[in-house]
Swiss-Prot record:
<keyword id="KW-0963">Cytoplasm</keyword>
<feature type="region of interest" description="Lysine-rich domain">
    <location>
        <begin position="49"/>
        <end position="71"/>
    </location>
</feature>
<dbReference type="GO" id="GO:0016598">
    <property type="term" value="P:protein arginylation"/>
</dbReference>
<feature type="compositionally biased region" description="Acidic residues">
    <location>
        <begin position="12"/>
        <end position="24"/>
    </location>
</feature>
<dbReference type="GO" id="GO:0140693">
    <property type="term" value="F:molecular condensate scaffold activity"/>
</dbReference>
<dbReference type="GO" id="GO:0005737">
    <property type="term" value="C:cytoplasm"/>
</dbReference>
<dbReference type="GO" id="GO:0005730">
    <property type="term" value="C:nucleolus"/>
</dbReference>
<feature type="repeat" description="1">
    <location>
        <begin position="169"/>
        <end position="178"/>
    </location>
</feature>
<feature type="region of interest" description="Disordered">
    <location>
        <begin position="1"/>
        <end position="108"/>
    </location>
</feature>
<comment type="subunit">
    <text>Self-associates (via Lys-rich domain); targets LIAT1 to the nucleolus. Interacts with ATE1; it is not a substrate of ATE1, the interaction takes place in the cytoplasm and seems to increase ATE1 arginyltransferase activity. Interacts with JMJD6 and MRPS14.</text>
</comment>
<feature type="compositionally biased region" description="Basic and acidic residues">
    <location>
        <begin position="90"/>
        <end position="108"/>
    </location>
</feature>
<feature type="compositionally biased region" description="Basic residues">
    <location>
        <begin position="50"/>
        <end position="63"/>
    </location>
</feature>
<dbReference type="GO" id="GO:0140694">
    <property type="term" value="P:membraneless organelle assembly"/>
</dbReference>
<feature type="region of interest" description="Interaction with ATE1">
    <location>
        <begin position="113"/>
        <end position="165"/>
    </location>
</feature>
<protein>
    <recommendedName>
        <fullName>Protein LIAT1</fullName>
    </recommendedName>
</protein>
<comment type="function">
    <text>Participates in nucleolar liquid-liquid phase separation (LLPS) through its N-terminal intrinsically disordered region (IDR). May be involved in ATE1-mediated N-terminal arginylation.</text>
</comment>
<dbReference type="InterPro" id="IPR038794">
    <property type="entry name" value="LIAT1"/>
</dbReference>
Amino acid sequence: MAGRGGTGAAEYGEEGEEEEEEEAREGGAEGSPGSKLPPIVGTASELAKRKVKKKKKKKKTKGSGKGDADKHHSRGRKNQPLSSSFHDILNPHKDHGLRAEPRDKEENRQTLPYSYSINHPCFAEIEDTLSSQINESLRWDGILTDPEAEKERIRIYKLNRRKRYRLMALKCFHSDPCVEESVENLPYLSDKDCSPCSKQPSSKGDHAHSYFEASKLLHPELATTVAE
């Protein structure tokens, strides 16, 4: 009866640890020799089944614990603050504000020279000086009443200008003093002769003859003829 009571308590009792079960088994085994009842058949198979069930339950409890941990971990990820890149994407107004500052600086730089030129008090004086320089490009003021005399005066001025340019070219390419002296000895028309008060302009033939003589004295590579 003691063996039956031990097995019944083991079957229908609460699930405990393995050590308690082994102690119960040992107690049942010790009480069985004193009793005359035969041993219960199938106890080994029942014990094996119980062990398998307990192992399955333990695995289930472990798996459920892992699932809870994963759930808590996912919740913790959701509760984490967003990184700076996500904040930049969600709040683009900050970037626009920072980019607008250099654009404003560039616009101010572009507008400063224009406003300075308009508000400058000497702007009118600069215009006057430029216009006077344009008028003085021919080295005299006004126009002669005689159109032929005006044409002759312009032609003489062009000849003298070419002479100056050639003299500069010779000084740059050649350092021969003889050539410089020959060019300097060429006839040069002064500004007084080109003034409107001049009564008799020089003849065309004399100036053309002097120009051809000057071209002969120059270097053969730079000598040119004028067909006028």
